[in-house]
């Protein structure tokens, strides 16, 4: 009669060991869940960035305003008849 409770206790201990320390244990599950959440956040950020780049590409294909804006900012475009002013911050 004493064998059955001991056998059940050993079985329970083995199952608990696998649950906490074995392959696919609870700590591994928690770590994987955290990793998935971080990856989902990174995917959301990259999706937003991709959408901005797609909009920028579409604007460059369709409109000349974006091309002119880039030429002014990156290449220093000044049209004929325009005067360029640069305002520097005061040094104090």
Curated annotation (Swiss-Prot):
InterPro entries referenced in this protein's UniProt entry, alphabetically: Cell_div_FtsB (IPR023081), FtsL/DivIC (IPR007060)
Keyword terms: Cell cycle, Cell division, Cell inner membrane, Cell membrane, Coiled coil, Membrane, Transmembrane, Transmembrane helix
Function: Essential cell division protein. May link together the upstream cell division proteins, which are predominantly cytoplasmic, with the downstream cell division proteins, which are predominantly periplasmic.
Chain coiled-coil ranges: 31-74
Family classification: Belongs to the FtsB family.
Topological category with respect to the lipid bilayer: Single-pass type II membrane protein
Keyword Cell cycle belongs to the record: yes
Residue spans, topological domain Periplasmic: 22-92
Subcellular location: Cell inner membrane
Name of the protein described by the UniProt record: Cell division protein FtsB
Ranges in the topological domain labelled Cytoplasmic: 1-3
Organism: Pseudoalteromonas atlantica (strain T6c / ATCC BAA-1087)
Broad class of where this protein is predominantly found: membrane
Gene Ontology BP terms: FtsZ-dependent cytokinesis
Alphabetized NCBIfam families for the sequence: PRK00888.1
Ranges annotated as spanning the membrane: 4-21
Classification of source organism: Bacteria, Pseudomonadati, Pseudomonadota, Gammaproteobacteria, Alteromonadales
Subunit: Part of a complex composed of FtsB, FtsL and FtsQ.
Keyword Cell inner membrane belongs to the record: yes
One GO cellular component, as annotated: plasma membrane
């Amino acid at each position: 009669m004493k064998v059955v409770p001991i056998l059940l206790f050993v079985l329970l201990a083995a199952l608990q060991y696998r649950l906490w320390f074995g392959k696919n244990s609870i700590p591994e599950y928690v770590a994987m869940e955290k990793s998935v959440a971080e990856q989902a956040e990174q995917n959301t950020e990259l999706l937003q960035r991709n959408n901005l780049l797609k909009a920028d590409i579409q604007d460059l294909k369709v409109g000349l305003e974006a091309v002119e804006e880039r030429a002014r900012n990156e290449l220093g475009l000044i049209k004929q008849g325009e005067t360029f002013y640069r305002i520097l911050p005061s040094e104090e």
